[in-house]
């Protein structure tokens, strides 16, 4: 077991705060419309350029164990904010540093850390209530675009594309972000149900230019088991041929003789057919096939119910307006399912989401819900270089998460203004002693820091701007760091999701409270062994040589 290094009191906290300062100084430069990029060296490939606070925070690991403990605590505030609200990571970092620094000064001056924490908690809860009261629900596409624009560092195109995607698939719909293979940035909307299984043979392709199989008005056969022999299916295949309509087979797998027979019939033109594997695994596969059955008004042929392929009639097959199958995906458009049955299935999945305690199960259920209740929108992000595409993709993902948060809990005035004005009612809070009052004062001062940092990143004096705004009674009155003007932030479209602002403050206060109430720190003692030489940027596995 490694020997331990033990530090006590203010010395331990001071060293932790040094680590917090190192991380916060790297992250804070990204805040606001005029925040800067950070370049991060990576073990392999080209460096990463980002303006995403949590990406910067996650990349930092300090050599000194005690300083690193502080940095890791601060990193946890940024990470938690990103997980819960999807944005606000830099704000959380700036707030946590300010709260921890001021709190430590007072602990060193003899204040009771537990009472300081109680005072801070009182203040934070009051600010959270103030944020909730001042939040405004967003409904219009324009407001959604504004949130996306601000969260993506003022990129209007990103805001507009996210708003368009949400309009197409609904606020609850599935929106994914992918790298495009060209320079453009597009929204591709897939109407209907899409799942990640492609055709089992390229011979099923009907459009050789796009390499997709397109089936118009097809029948859909859903079979729970593997298909290795078509003999039991002959009656149903003959009925489909007579109807002169295409057939899509979705089964656990189609293999051997069965697949070969389908391919031969497809090539001879006797049967327009395509086969794909069923999506998902195990019980989830069965549930997804039942979803498809309801969506297409078909039946899942399952031996659990005593159903056999040879007894299946054409009435048991589902139907849809169109099915498009690529090498990797299948899209069922306009299934002919009964609307009432689909709504009942949606309600059933929603109740399962409410009951489950597993995050993984919840995510998979939400995917099923989205597939049934809406379409799928794909934001395809392009650019001139790989570095540019990755940087922009990061911003798109941030903006998408922030927009979802805005739809959920509404928006407040942006640019740090809401936190600044929310500090004013805190002076009226009732406390039990002067130490708790000092805890409230810590929060009041810290709430000025995000706005100060935004202004300073824009090249102006943060203290002067804060003073001017506090003189103004209008809570929406703020400083537009992009145009360097004082404006009504809501009217100017400078808005933040209430959930992002709230989460940033709560996570920051949680971490700061841990730091000021820490009295002893135990870390592994540094090893005397010489560390191996680190690889320099270059070819991985080639001794770090640069050519």
Swiss-Prot record:
UniProt KW Nucleus keyword: no
Disordered: annotated segments: 527-547
Enzyme class: isomerase
InterPro entries named among the record's database cross-references: Chaperonin_Cpn60_CS (IPR018370), Cpn60/GroEL (IPR001844), Cpn60/GroEL/TCP-1 (IPR002423), GroEL-like_apical_dom_sf (IPR027409), GROEL-like_equatorial_sf (IPR027413), TCP-1-like_intermed_sf (IPR027410)
A Pfam family per the record: Cpn60_TCP1
Keywords linked to the UniProt accession: ATP-binding, Chaperone, Cytoplasm, Isomerase, Nucleotide-binding
Record GO biological process: protein refolding
GO molecular function, one term: ATP binding
Keyword Nucleotide-binding: yes
Catalytic activity: ATP + H2O + a folded polypeptide = ADP + phosphate + an unfolded polypeptide
Assembly, per entry: Forms a cylinder of 14 subunits composed of two heptameric rings stacked back-to-back. Interacts with the co-chaperonin GroES.
Function: Together with its co-chaperonin GroES, plays an essential role in assisting protein folding. The GroEL-GroES system forms a nano-cage that allows encapsulation of the non-native substrate proteins and provides a physical environment optimized to promote and accelerate protein folding.
Protein name: Chaperonin GroEL
Species of the source: Rickettsia rickettsii (strain Sheila Smith)
Lineage: Bacteria, Pseudomonadati, Pseudomonadota, Alphaproteobacteria, Rickettsiales
